[in-house]
Amino acid sequence: MAHRAQVGLQDATSPIMEELVIFHDHALMIIFLICFLVLYALFLTLTTKLTNTNISDAQEMETIWTTLPAIILILIALPSLRILYLTDEINDPSFTIKSIGHQWYWTYEYTDYGGLIFNSYMLPPLFLEPGDLRLLDVDNRVVLPVEAPVRMMITSQDVLHSWTVPSLGLKTDAIPGRLNQTTFTATRPGVYYGQCSEICGANHSFMPIVLELIPLKIFEMGPVFAL
C-alpha cells in the first residue's frame, strides 16, 4: 500500500504489477542514459576549442544518430507491447465480479456467489476508527481471494469513471453503455487501496476502492460476505 511521502511505486501484489515495475526501471535506465549522452555532448561542444567550419558531410554521424534512436525505441517498445498483451489476457478466471461506477460511489455484484450486491461508499471523517485512512477507507470492502484468477467486469451508470488499484497494476475505464473487463491474480493477502482515476464531477476525489485479499480457503467459507 501507499505510505506518507512515498516517492517510488507501491509494492507489487500481482504478476502484472511486477512486470510494470521491471519495465519502469528498464525505461528509466534508458532515459538516464540518453540524458547523460546529451549532456556529455553539450559539455564537449561548449568546452572544446577544436572546431572546423568547413565540414559539409558526416556520413558516419548521420548513420549513428538515425540508427541509435531506432534501436532505443525498439528496446522500449518490445517490453511495453508484451505487458500490454499480458494485461488483456483472460486466463480462465475462477469467478467474476461486476463493478458499476456511480457519482460518487461503487456498486459490486458477486454474480457467482448468490448474486450478492452491495454499495461501497467512502467513510466520512466522523466514522473513521483508529488506523483507518482518510479519504481511502469505505464502509463495505471488496473481499477477494489470493492466488486465484479474478475477472472484474467494469461499467458505469452515469459518467466516465476509472477503476484503479495501483498495487495490482489495474486501471480500467468505466464507460456508460459499455462493459470492460480485466483479470488479475493477487499474490499476497492484505488490504489494498485505489481510487477513481477519471475526473467524474465534484466529488471525484471521494470514491475510493478498497480490496481485502484473504486466503482462498477462508474466502470459500462464506461468512466473509456478511457486510
UniProtKB/Swiss-Prot annotation:
Protein name in the entry: Cytochrome c oxidase subunit 2
UniProt keywords (A-Z) are: Copper, Electron transport, Magnesium, Membrane, Metal-binding, Mitochondrion, Mitochondrion inner membrane, Respiratory chain, Translocase, Transmembrane, Transmembrane helix, Transport
Say what the protein does.
Answer: Component of the cytochrome c oxidase, the last enzyme in the mitochondrial electron transport chain which drives oxidative phosphorylation. The respiratory chain contains 3 multisubunit complexes succinate dehydrogenase (complex II, CII), ubiquinol-cytochrome c oxidoreductase (cytochrome b-c1 complex, complex III, CIII) and cytochrome c oxidase (complex IV, CIV), that cooperate to transfer electrons derived from NADH and succinate to molecular oxygen, creating an electrochemical gradient over the inner membrane that drives transmembrane transport and the ATP synthase.
Q: Which residues form a coiled coil?
A: none
Q: How is the cofactor bound?
A: Binds a dinuclear copper A center per subunit.
**Membrane topology, as annotated:** Multi-pass membrane protein
Question: In the record, what lineage is assigned to the organism producing the protein?
Answer: Eukaryota, Metazoa, Chordata, Craniata, Vertebrata
Q: Which residues lie on this side of the membrane: Mitochondrial matrix?
A: 46-59
**What residue ranges are annotated as transmembrane?**
15-45, 60-87
Cofactor(s) needed, names only, are: Cu cation
Chain positions recorded as Mg(2+) binding sites: E198
Q: What is its subcellular localisation? A: Mitochondrion inner membrane
UniProt-annotated binding residues for Cu cation A2: C196, E198, C200, H204
Q: What is the effect of changing F184L?
A: In strain: Isolate San Diego zoo Ppy3
Residues annotated as binding Cu cation A1 are H161, C196, C200, M207
Q: What is its EC number?
A: 7.1.1.9
Molecular function terms, GO-annotated: copper ion binding; cytochrome-c oxidase activity
Q: What class of enzyme is it?
A: translocase
- Show the catalytic activity: 4 Fe(II)-[cytochrome c] + O2 + 8 H(+)(in) = 4 Fe(III)-[cytochrome c] + 2 H2O + 4 H(+)(out)
